[in-house]
Amino acid sequence: MSNKVKSDIEIASVAEILPVTTIAEHLGLDADALELYGKYKAKLSYDTIHSLKDKEQGKLVLVTAINPTPAGEGKSTVTVGLGDALSKKDKKTVIALREPSLGPTMGIKGGATGGGYAQVIPMEDINLHFTGDFHAITAANNALSAFIDNHMQQGNDLGIDGRRIVWKRVVDLNDRALRKVVVGLGGPIQGVPREDGFDITVASEIMAIICLASDLKDLKKRLSEIVIGYNYKKEPITVGEMGYEGALTLLLKDALKPNLVQTLEHTPAIVHGGPFANIAHGCNSVSATSTALKLGEYVVTEAGFGADLGAEKFLDIKVPALGKAPDCVVIVATIRALKMHGGALKTELSEENVDALAKGFTNLQKHTESIQTFGIPYVVAINKFITDSDAEVAKLEQLCEEHGIPFSLTEVWEKGGDGGLELADKVIAAVESGEEDYKRIYDDAWSIEEKLEAIVTKVYGGIGVELSSKAQKQIVEFKKYGWDRYPICMAKTQYSLSDDPTLLGRPTDFVIHIREFIPKLGAGFVVALTGDVMTMPGLPKKPAALNMDVDENGNAQGLF
């Protein structure tokens, strides 16, 4: 008998999948509430969303993690498995996830719909083109770029300074060659030559806007507030001044609607939006989460990368827009990541190393302290891998007990919802404890410097911030325009609490270096670029795409 471990797509391809209309029935919705995209995917109509507005909200559980290894620590897997486990506990549960980006799917991740026996399906569709949301966002973003270049070509009534355009084109791929380009070459009729560049679609401000807009009216307002660049007087120019917010809203009207799918165990899953947490705010859409809260007793959602990135942004940026804080936070930790933080080489993470695990435990400690700073009860989910030794598991459990950290050994990758029943019990207990006393770590009225200081000292564990001369000048400019009242969205490496990806564990006495700010007024925040973080990733030497294929029957291979 073969002991070969099945791949995610092998598991998903033989799973029983129910019609999405049946999944909707579990939520009390009939077929008329859906806009079908085939048999197993649907969007929730605006009428449906509007009909739920007066319903009581359920309980919200946020899943985050420690600082990850490049392969990720199974946050989506735990989110799905916990949702299935809560369903087994007779809690009416809805999972709210982000949509995967094609860039990392083709690059390093190979997919992002959970893993093993804790997946959302149809995973092939979700990982590739899904319902076309990302394509619509890409089209809207690049339409705006075309409108800008056309305006300059056709007389430039607004006096747009081509040297000071901050709006970039996007593509939903990892393509380092497009980071900096020149457009408008070829003579007078081909446009006005200028420097430009591409970001990945998930870093687009329009992606953030889709994920923070409450409805079509709010979407249009936010689009109008996008700053595309500056005129020759160095004054900001917005989409509203150009007059294209209506056209952009038209392109995005369907992309704003949340998508309904299911898990392998048929728990309803609303999958919508997908900003990265290292270069954007890292949370699925407000529309998806708020709709899920009206449909379920329990909603399990996630925020990208570690608690220093996704969770901080969820709590400081998304919660005010959502109008509800999490009732409990789950922090996903893996033995392999803790060993990495304790000094083990990336090539040796599958080998037993109890000493490295003990040293790396400080990274987990810091993240638990950060969540407590926000006043929210938490549970650590030890996401068990088949390479974890019994001695390592015992040591991590011992360390958690010694430090009073609530935890649960979680085996949802191998066992699905059954592997998360203890975690579900502890989450339910934390939610029902009523201990949630949410507080943001800064107020919007604070200065940019004060907000940065709060994030760095309270969440990262650093001692302060160092601003480049450009960043210092920008702060003066932003105060003049009133932009200093917006929340801060840090663009930072996901691998370290600092802005140095090689500084692992729990570093101390470090400063965060801010090289530049980007106003994202439509999204409603100011991005602070730290270190060398890129808004357009590159591909690894051997992309995951090398292992992807499709057979003669149209079945995908190599998605994992």
Swiss-Prot record:
It is an enzyme of class 6 (ligase). Coiled coil: none annotated. InterPro entries: Formate_THF_ligase, Formate_THF_ligase_CS, P-loop_NTPase. Pathway: One-carbon metabolism; tetrahydrofolate interconversion. ATP binds at residues 69-76. Keywords: ATP-binding, Ligase, Nucleotide-binding, One-carbon metabolism. GO terms for biological process: tetrahydrofolate interconversion. It catalyses: (6S)-5,6,7,8-tetrahydrofolate + formate + ATP = (6R)-10-formyltetrahydrofolate + ADP + phosphate. GO terms for molecular function: ATP binding; formate-tetrahydrofolate ligase activity. Its EC number is 6.3.4.3. Belongs to the formate--tetrahydrofolate ligase family. This is Formate--tetrahydrofolate ligase. It comes from Listeria innocua serovar 6a (strain ATCC BAA-680 / CLIP 11262).
